[in-house]
Design a protein with these regions (language model features):
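Patatin-like phospholipase
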Residues: 1-176
């Protein structure tokens, strides 16, 4: 049995808050993983203890502050976007307001996600400059959709990530 703590990040649709449940047993705690990967518009909300949840990335895209709060001093962040990427404002604002009208705090999160994401990027890049986090990310855009199913594209992106990790391995071990 591993002593490593594993937390999922899920977004409470009613409160608009990120929650970080511990996943202790993958046989019984799969509901947290399901909620954590339930993308807005594409997935149904996941009910947990009477509350409805969706993807944690809506409320906390890169949960580095939670990791630091948990006492982790060596953090490795694996990104799927290159360093130049910045999120743009979603064009789905009105659709979000209609689809999630019973959850105004969630709608607000959806409408401000781009700015919060870009702020956390600046934060992690500053931490990287200070030597407080280690970031692995592609050098160029991957040109991959969020729900990509093309096996050739997925294999190519996997290989890019693997090669980038190999290239950065020595520096990462030095950081650790």
């Amino acid at each position: 049995k591993s002593r490593t703590r594993f937390q999922a990040v899920i977004t409470n649709c009613r409160t608009g808050e990120a929650e970080y449940p511990d996943v202790k047993d993958f046989r019984t705690d799969t509901v947290y993983i399901r909620a954590s990967s339930s993308l807005p518009f594409l997935s149904k909300m996941v009910k947990i203890n009477g509350e409805l949840y969706l993807d944690g990335g809506v409320s906390d895209s890169i949960p580095i502050k939670k990791s630091i709060e948990n006492g982790n001093t060596k953090n490795i962040i694996i990104m799927t976007r290159d360093k130049k990427y910045r999120k743009k404002q979603s064009k789905l604002g009105k659709i979000s307001a209609i689809r999630y009208k019973k959850y105004p705090k969630f709608v607000e999160l959806m409408n401000t996600r781009f700015s919060r994401y870009n702020e956390i990027l600046e934060y992690i890049y500053e931490l990287e400059r200070q030597g407080k986090v280690f970031i692995i990310q592609p050098e160029t855009p991957l040109n991959l959709g969020r729900i990509e199913k093309n096996k050739e594209k997925l294999t190519n992106v996997y290989n890019i990530g693997y090669k980038e990790a190999e290239k950065r391995y020595s520096a990462m071990m030095e950081y650790l």
